[in-house]
């Protein structure tokens, strides 16, 4: 489903109630909210209707800006081969920094080789800086790597860049700095454990609310992109489950253009929608205006079967008028007054303009719904009375979820500090060694091999 509307027209309230209905029905739901208000309003509505209470273990509330609990999200400790994991993270980087990385020719090779090495050891993104600048530590890790291409890249190319190395690896290190210097990202992405198991959330019908409202723009884009690429991979991994038994999961992504199929993305939006739907992940994409989208996204928007258009700006109204509007070549503007006169037919340009005005001047809580059969229906939504829920009740629901799935903030800091103070390959190795096989997979090897 696709939803568009400028601020104040009712788009967020529609998403809120769609989410609530899915949660109440016991469906798996995921919300990525870049502003934070929608996630909080969903909790208020659920508390008012007594759907999600503090004892409900379905709820996972993820707010990386909190200073009491951290939910570990180790994107390198996820299902898939090291190569698949690396490609997913590189794709998220490209969606976060599309312009700068398109101009960095060495980024893809450096990042892929580094991420494959770290993923095989079940390390974290914040270890990437040390891997790239500490040759002794890098060599200790490469001793455990069986993939000749990865080893060859570092020993035969990377280590031979000499004085040019700082310049050639700078594009990668600049992006690594985004999460090594940022306290929120460092603690979330720097834990060895991963407690945001997106595949499990889908399969078990859990509710993940991601509140990015207090994050800065770069943090918001990076975490959102990592989550969306993770959702794409988790959905694709469900091919091992018969289609008839795949539990549907519904993901709502507000301001989706920042996280999916933007100019830096390898995948097109059409590909993402098709692949996710095939494996039981149903996406609802929302944003404010078409100028936020690249041209290649526009065609995909036209192919989405269900579109809901709230009040939009003039330019957008003109585009959607042609998409959902209908004109009548036989429509009469003025009837003939005498037998010798002919009726005056309504010019098509005027009819298209009428549709444009309708879309532009839609009052709040009114929208046009474009159905799969091409018809468009105008809808009205009712006003909802304010929720009689206190901020303290919402906070208690969040804290109950964080206590269940999170790690105390100070404990997360201590864990990373302890790892940084350790040295040697065994200090950062996992309980069992994992080596990259020649085909990019992971195989177990005896400790110390």
What is each residue range found by the language model?
Residues 288:
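Active-site glycine-centered loops adjacent to acidic/histidine catalytic or metal-binding residues
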Residues 1, 102, 270-273, 293-435, ...:
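P-loop NTPase motor core of the ASCE superfamily
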Residues 4-9, 14-281, 285, 294-297, ...:
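P-loop NTPase motor domains
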